[in-house]
Amino acid sequence: MTVLASNDPPTAVLNAEQIMGLLPHRYPFALVDRVLEHVPGERAVALKNVTFNEPQFQGHFPGRPLMPGVLIVEAMAQVGGLIVTQMPDLPKGLFVFAGIDGVRFRRPVVPGDQLRITCELLSLKRKRFGKVKAEATVDGQLVCSGELMFSLVD
């Protein structure tokens, strides 16, 4: 496990190219830019840089761009997917986002923000169903939290 001290600059444990080798998502749905911490089967911490030239900001909302909540949740799910999909001794296949519980949005996310997403595995059942606790922060302030479920599709 690699962990950064709080005063260290964010350096990548996994860079964008390595992330693309682990997750099936591609532009415009590749929402993980850098992984800072990755312990398969336990925990992951990653960054999503929110930029004005992302396609959703053309219509959400003109004159006041806000990152859609569903994309914040999707970014959290992708980080959670890094935990579940990289566990040893799991059957091969595609883990898909299967549900959410208790998701709350605390503040808006706008272009220029950097989401820091932390996910921790809560449970894994029958090597097919996983649940993670997820939190997204901007500048140390909580913007979104909840529990995300994953299911293995053969």
UniProtKB/Swiss-Prot annotation:
Any single GO CC term annotated in Swiss-Prot or TrEMBL for this entry: membrane
InterPro entries, alphabetized: FabA_FabZ, FabZ, HotDog_dom_sf
Subcellular localization, as worded in the UniProt entry: Cytoplasm
Known EC number: 4.2.1.59
Keyword Lipid biosynthesis: yes
Main location class: cytoplasm
Catalytic activity: a (3R)-hydroxyacyl-[ACP] = a (2E)-enoyl-[ACP] + H2O
GO process terms (BP): fatty acid biosynthetic process; lipid A biosynthetic process
Enzyme class: lyase
GO molecular function terms listed in the Swiss-Prot or TrEMBL record: (3R)-hydroxyacyl-[acyl-carrier-protein] dehydratase activity
Entry keyword annotation includes Lyase: yes
CDD domains (UniProt xref): FabZ
Active site, per annotation: 60
Keyword annotations of the record: Cytoplasm, Lipid A biosynthesis, Lipid biosynthesis, Lipid metabolism, Lyase
NCBIfam families the UniProt entry points to: fabZ (TIGR01750), PRK00006.1 (NF000582)
Family: Belongs to the thioester dehydratase family. FabZ subfamily.
Physiological role: Involved in unsaturated fatty acids biosynthesis. Catalyzes the dehydration of short chain beta-hydroxyacyl-ACPs and long chain saturated and unsaturated beta-hydroxyacyl-ACPs.
Annotated protein name in UniProt: 3-hydroxyacyl-[acyl-carrier-protein] dehydratase FabZ
The species this protein was found in: Synechococcus sp. (strain CC9311)
Taxonomic lineage: Bacteria, Bacillati, Cyanobacteriota, Cyanophyceae, Synechococcales
Underlying gene: fabZ
